[in-house]
């Protein structure tokens, strides 16, 4: 599977999970301890606009953390992920992009961040809502490899005051999605 197919697979399945959230799910806790399901969906949809802008060569507008869930959120997310995939397909990764405003970041790095962000939060959402885990072993393994060889392998991003918790040891015999969740600081 090439990079664009991988991205389409992760984002498409994650959009399916967002669409699968039921009204009774909003207050459920998630493995991402700072979010319940509603706050997690708000985070995912809010940040999708920034990832969309980066993929399409625009400067992100607005505060992704200010997004509030509505009855249109699943549709907004589906549109954003379609645009994200199209942006990376049309413009490539060999360029600098802006994810959070001023300053450029390597396109490949932001592309990989997109994969990790939405695979991790897709796992969180499926786990919290009881939906079937939609990601294939190959997809999860490829994203795990990228995560293990990227900046998140550095301890400076992990801990109580950092975006990610410590790596949770998961047996090598476990499915790749569980090993990925452990790498991202979740306890599968």
What kind of feature is each model-predicted range?
Residues 40:
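Extended, alpha-helix-rich binding/interface surfaces that flank or overlap catalytic cores
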Residues 2-13, 20-33, 49-188:
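Structured surface interface patches that mediate subunit assembly and partner/cofactor docking
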Residues 44:
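Glycine-rich loop at the start of a catalytic domain that most often binds anionic cofactors/ligands
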């Amino acid at each position: 599977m090439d990079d664009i197919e991988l991205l389409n697979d992760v984002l498409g399945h994650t959009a399916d999970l967002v669409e699968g959230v039921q009204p009774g799910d909003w207050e459920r806790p998630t493995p991402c301890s700072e979010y319940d399901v509603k706050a997690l969906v708000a985070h995912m949809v809010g940040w999708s606009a920034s990832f969309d802008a980066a993929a399409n060569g625009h400067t992100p507008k607005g505060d992704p953390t200010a997004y509030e869930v509505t009855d249109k959120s699943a549709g907004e997310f589906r549109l954003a992920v379609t645009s994200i995939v199209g942006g990376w397909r049309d413009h490539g990764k060999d360029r600098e992009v802006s994810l959070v405003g001023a300053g450029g970041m390597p396109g490949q790095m932001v592309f990989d961040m997109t994969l990790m962000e939405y695979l991790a939060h897709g796992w969180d959402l499926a786990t919290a809502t009881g939906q079937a885990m939609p990601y294939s072993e190959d997809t999860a393994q490829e994203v795990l490899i990228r995560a293990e060889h990227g900046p998140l392998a550095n301890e400076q991003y992990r801990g109580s005051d950092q975006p990610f918790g410590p790596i949770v040891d998961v047996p090598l015999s476990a499915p790749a999605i569980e090993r990925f969740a452990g790498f991202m600081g979740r306890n599968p």
